[in-house]
């Protein structure tokens, strides 16, 4: 379940979906956490709100067609996390109305659709 936090900035309430912080040594670069176990084959739930935090805690404001780098934790708690790249899209599927943003996976030219952190170090 996503955790939403809020704070005041310039007189406006800003809502941020907390991501999963991850030791940068376990990733190749800052990435946004996504659960790769979803109901579709190339779309995954991304966020309920417009701002999400990456693995380093940086706030990322989501926009349509924005390219992002994502990860999911290894299901066996190994340090070799699963990686992917994608494009942010609005959820216009008519399903799961509480989810505003989805990510569409774009295969990486070098590694394919999904790849491991260890692949980036070869």
Q: Which residues does each predicted region cover?
A:
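Short, charged beta-turn/beta-strand-edge "cap" motif at the junction between a beta-strand
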Residues: 72-78
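Glycine- and charge-enriched low-complexity intrinsically disordered segments
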Residues: 92-122
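Short alpha-helix capping/helix-loop boundary micro-motifs
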Residues: 47-58
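Extended boundary segments
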Residues: 2-30, 108-118
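Short beta-strand-centered aromatic/proline hotspots
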Residues: 79-92
């Amino acid at each position: 379940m996503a955790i939403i936090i809020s704070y005041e900035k310039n007189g406006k309430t800003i809502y941020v979906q907390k991501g999963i912080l991850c030791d940068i040594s376990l990733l190749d670069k800052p990435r946004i956490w996504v659960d790769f176990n979803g109901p579709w084959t190339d779309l995954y739930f991304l966020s309920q709100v417009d701002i999400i935090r990456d693995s380093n805690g940086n706030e990322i404001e989501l926009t349509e067609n924005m390219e992002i780098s994502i990860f999911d934790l290894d299901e066996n708690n190994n340090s070799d996390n699963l990686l992917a790249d994608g494009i942010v899209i609005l959820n216009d599927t008519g399903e799961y109305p509480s989810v505003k943003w989805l990510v569409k996976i774009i295969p990486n030219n070098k590694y394919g659709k999904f790849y491991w952190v260890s692949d980036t170090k070869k």
